[in-house]
Amino acid sequence: MKATSEELAIFVSVVESGSFSRAAEQLGQANSAVSRAVKKLEMKLGVSLLNRTTRQLSLTEEGERYFRRVQSILQEMAAAESEIMETRNTPRGLLRIDAATPVVLHFLMPLIKPFRERYPEVTLSLVSSETIINLIERKVDVAIRAGTLTDSSLRARPLFNSYRKIIASPDYISRYGKPETIDDLKQHICLGFTEPASLNTWPIARSDGQLHEVKYGLSSNSGETLKQLCLSGNGIACLSDYMIDKEIARGELVELMADKVLPVEMPFSAVYYSDRAVSTRIRAFIDFLSEHVKTAPGGAVREA
């Protein structure tokens, strides 16, 4: 007997999610039904597709080859159906978006009202995460991510580029003065990230040409928290321009060592899974973000 499309879809879901239980939850089926479908598929093929242990699932050699082919076939089927539906569908339904808190507050927040006015049938759910999450496990449709994409199962649409600036409040400067060199900076209270540690490497070069790794006196996993600490005069921070430029323009923050800061670019992208047919609401949202970046006032964001 030939395998059914439902059996193929269940098999791919099990592999992508990493377990029968997660696949069952995503598909809205019982664990036993999902397990039976995969066993039935293996019986039809006459081979074992999965190595099953109490701790994890892994693909057999035959399973690996079969998974790649089946996944590609299902993607093409979904894409074909999506293309047909898109010709007559208006964007609608729930759209789940994940981004770090500063991105939500300073990039996405001004766009929510105009997006909903244009697409009133789309319901938005915003999630703020300070760490990288698994989009499938958290049921996220689109994530706004900084840095270079490394996961081959994801697609990314470049949105804008950001550059970090070293800043302090006027109150802090009046009490402790302005650092002019890295040696000066070492004598000041610096605000750092508990994670990711890479953000504690500031874009200023030491005498050996390497970027300076700051030793911090206060830390947080949230850039927005560090910004508030900085505004309150607690120390010197190094944060992305898109989240502090307004405060600099208003005189609430002062840019430091501008002549020594290197233009280390940080790209931001809209990220989504490549194994899904892109729904009209996902495409509409990403297109809307790209449109905003192209038409934003100078200095708001730098188009990627």
Curated annotation (Swiss-Prot):
UniProt cross-references to SUPFAM superfamilies, sorted A to Z: Periplasmic binding protein-like II, Winged helix' DNA-binding domain
Molecular function GO labels: DNA-binding transcription factor activity; transcription cis-regulatory region binding
Signal peptide start and end residues: none
Record-annotated DNA-binding residue ranges: 20-39
Alphabetical keyword list: DNA-binding, Transcription, Transcription regulation
Entry superkingdom: Bacteria
Ranges where the HTH lysR-type domain occurs: 1-60
GO biological process: regulation of DNA-templated transcription; response to ionizing radiation
Stated family: Belongs to the LysR transcriptional regulatory family.
The protein's name in its UniProt record: Uncharacterized HTH-type transcriptional regulator YafC
Organism listed in the record: Escherichia coli (strain K12)
